[in-house]
Amino acid sequence: MSMMSEFKEFALKGNVMDLAVGVIIGGAFSGITNSLVEDIIMPIVAFIAGGELNFKNMFILLGDAPEGVAMTYDALKEAGVPLLAYGSFITVLINFLILAFIIFMMVKGMNKMRRKNEVEEVVEETPSEEVLLLREISQKLSK
């Protein structure tokens, strides 16, 4: 078998194609999750916290800020000032938790469906009453 035909067989197997589709959908879903966190959840948290709260501008200055530079994350980062950007980390952490929860729920649903199918298969393998009766008669006759 040539290397090219082996690669085709590998690439066209169901698991590899499923993985490729999953990665593409995951990339698109990442944008949805980011928007959910930044455009919906964080503004609600800011409102509850009592006003306009920009998580991106939550940081600790680790160096001296040059004169004339605004004390915002973007301006300080552009000026090369070292920052501990814990606000951005909070946003990314919330993104991760939401994504992990959604994936958990999807896997949980798939496992439930898989278990249901396994139970149905086991039920199908149970012999009917007629078969059980015939086995019993056969055993009594063989004695």
Swiss-Prot record:
This is Large-conductance mechanosensitive channel. NCBIfam families: mscL, PRK13952.1. The keyword Membrane applies. The chain crosses the membrane at residues 16-36, 40-60, 87-107. It is a multi-pass membrane protein. It is found in: Cell inner membrane. Belongs to the MscL family.
